[in-house]
Amino acid sequence: MVKPNETEFKQKISIIRDQFEVCTPYLTTLSDPVRQKILLILAESGTDGMDVQDITAKISLSRPAISHHLKILKDAGMIISHKKGTQVYYFIYIYKALDKIINLVNTVLNLVKNIDMESIKEKAPWMLNSPSN
Protein backbone atom coordinates (compact mmCIF):
# COMPACT_ATOMS: atom_id res chain seq x y z
CA MET A 1 0.00 0.00 0.00
CA VAL A 2 1.30 3.44 -0.88
CA LYS A 3 1.87 5.71 2.05
CA PRO A 4 0.16 9.07 1.41
CA ASN A 5 2.36 12.11 1.70
CA GLU A 6 1.78 14.48 4.59
CA THR A 7 0.20 17.23 2.46
CA GLU A 8 -2.27 14.80 0.88
CA PHE A 9 -3.12 13.37 4.30
CA LYS A 10 -3.73 16.84 5.77
CA GLN A 11 -6.00 17.69 2.83
CA LYS A 12 -8.04 14.54 3.44
CA ILE A 13 -8.30 15.34 7.14
CA SER A 14 -9.45 18.86 6.27
CA ILE A 15 -12.16 17.45 3.99
CA ILE A 16 -13.31 15.07 6.73
CA ARG A 17 -13.36 17.91 9.25
CA ASP A 18 -15.60 19.92 6.89
CA GLN A 19 -17.85 16.91 6.34
CA PHE A 20 -18.18 16.36 10.09
CA GLU A 21 -19.18 20.01 10.47
CA VAL A 22 -21.89 19.58 7.83
CA CYS A 23 -23.09 16.29 9.36
CA THR A 24 -23.06 17.28 13.03
CA PRO A 25 -26.63 18.68 13.01
CA TYR A 26 -27.88 15.51 11.29
CA LEU A 27 -26.02 13.20 13.66
CA THR A 28 -27.16 15.17 16.70
CA THR A 29 -30.75 15.05 15.48
CA LEU A 30 -30.56 11.31 14.84
CA SER A 31 -29.01 10.60 18.24
CA ASP A 32 -32.32 11.08 20.07
CA PRO A 33 -34.42 7.88 20.44
CA VAL A 34 -37.72 9.78 20.23
CA ARG A 35 -36.72 11.38 16.93
CA GLN A 36 -35.62 7.98 15.67
CA LYS A 37 -39.09 6.61 16.51
CA ILE A 38 -40.77 9.56 14.81
CA LEU A 39 -38.72 9.02 11.65
CA LEU A 40 -39.65 5.34 11.59
CA ILE A 41 -43.34 6.13 12.16
CA LEU A 42 -43.26 8.66 9.32
CA ALA A 43 -41.45 6.18 7.10
CA GLU A 44 -44.23 3.65 7.78
CA SER A 45 -46.87 6.24 6.89
CA GLY A 46 -45.33 6.66 3.44
CA THR A 47 -47.02 9.25 1.25
CA ASP A 48 -50.00 9.54 3.61
CA GLY A 49 -48.01 11.43 6.22
CA MET A 50 -49.16 11.91 9.79
CA ASP A 51 -50.31 14.80 11.93
CA VAL A 52 -49.14 15.51 15.48
CA GLN A 53 -52.17 13.76 16.97
CA ASP A 54 -51.47 10.55 15.02
CA ILE A 55 -47.81 10.59 16.02
CA THR A 56 -48.70 11.30 19.67
CA ALA A 57 -50.99 8.25 19.66
CA LYS A 58 -48.02 6.06 18.74
CA ILE A 59 -45.50 7.57 21.18
CA SER A 60 -46.15 8.11 24.88
CA LEU A 61 -45.30 11.80 24.92
CA SER A 62 -47.35 14.98 25.07
CA ARG A 63 -48.32 16.87 21.93
CA PRO A 64 -45.98 19.76 22.84
CA ALA A 65 -43.08 17.30 23.24
CA ILE A 66 -43.85 15.68 19.87
CA SER A 67 -44.15 19.13 18.27
CA HIS A 68 -40.75 20.05 19.71
CA HIS A 69 -39.14 16.95 18.17
CA LEU A 70 -40.91 17.55 14.85
CA LYS A 71 -39.50 21.09 14.78
CA ILE A 72 -35.97 19.77 15.34
CA LEU A 73 -36.41 17.18 12.59
CA LYS A 74 -37.84 19.78 10.23
CA ASP A 75 -35.07 22.30 11.01
CA ALA A 76 -32.51 19.58 10.25
CA GLY A 77 -34.18 18.94 6.89
CA MET A 78 -35.19 15.39 7.74
CA ILE A 79 -38.93 15.83 7.44
CA ILE A 80 -41.26 18.09 5.50
CA SER A 81 -44.77 19.25 6.29
CA HIS A 82 -47.86 20.00 4.27
CA LYS A 83 -50.94 21.81 5.51
CA LYS A 84 -54.35 20.37 4.58
CA GLY A 85 -57.04 22.66 5.95
CA THR A 86 -56.24 23.14 9.62
CA GLN A 87 -54.14 19.98 9.87
CA VAL A 88 -50.38 19.84 9.29
CA TYR A 89 -49.12 16.51 7.98
CA TYR A 90 -45.51 15.45 8.31
CA PHE A 91 -43.54 13.26 5.91
CA ILE A 92 -40.09 11.73 6.11
CA TYR A 93 -37.63 13.43 3.76
CA ILE A 94 -34.21 12.33 4.94
CA TYR A 95 -32.45 11.92 1.58
CA LYS A 96 -30.13 14.94 1.78
CA ALA A 97 -29.06 14.15 5.34
CA LEU A 98 -28.38 10.50 4.53
CA ASP A 99 -26.41 11.46 1.43
CA LYS A 100 -24.16 13.75 3.49
CA ILE A 101 -23.70 11.12 6.23
CA ILE A 102 -22.93 8.40 3.68
CA ASN A 103 -20.33 10.66 2.05
CA LEU A 104 -18.70 11.28 5.43
CA VAL A 105 -18.61 7.58 6.29
CA ASN A 106 -17.16 6.69 2.88
CA THR A 107 -14.49 9.40 3.13
CA VAL A 108 -13.43 8.23 6.60
CA LEU A 109 -13.50 4.61 5.47
CA ASN A 110 -11.27 5.38 2.48
CA LEU A 111 -8.81 7.23 4.70
CA VAL A 112 -8.68 4.40 7.23
CA LYS A 113 -8.31 1.76 4.52
CA ASN A 114 -5.26 3.61 3.21
CA ILE A 115 -3.41 3.68 6.51
CA ASP A 116 -0.09 2.02 5.97
CA MET A 117 -0.19 -1.34 7.79
CA GLU A 118 3.59 -1.39 8.08
CA SER A 119 3.47 1.87 10.03
CA ILE A 120 0.83 0.41 12.33
CA LYS A 121 2.92 -2.70 12.94
CA GLU A 122 5.92 -0.53 13.73
CA LYS A 123 4.36 2.33 15.69
CA ALA A 124 1.11 0.94 17.14
CA PRO A 125 1.11 -2.86 17.14
CA TRP A 126 -1.53 -2.89 19.88
CA MET A 127 -4.06 -1.73 17.23
CA LEU A 128 -3.75 -5.08 15.47
CA ASN A 129 -4.96 -6.93 18.58
CA SER A 130 -7.87 -4.68 19.50
CA PRO A 131 -11.21 -6.44 20.21
CA SER A 132 -12.91 -4.59 17.35
CA ASN A 133 -10.73 -6.31 14.72
Describe the residue ranges of each PLM region:
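Alpha-helical residues within the helix-turn-helix
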Residues: A57, H68, K74-D75
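N-terminal helix-turn-helix DNA-binding core of bacterial DNA-binding proteins
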Residues: E21-S62, V88-A97
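Base-recognition residues in the alpha-helical recognition helix of bacterial helix-turn-helix
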Residues: L40, H68-H69
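Amphipathic alpha-helical dimerization/coiled-coil segments
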Residues: V2-V22, A43, Y93-N133
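Conserved H-loop
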Residues: A65
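Beta-hairpin "wing" of winged helix-turn-helix
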Residues: K74-K84, F91
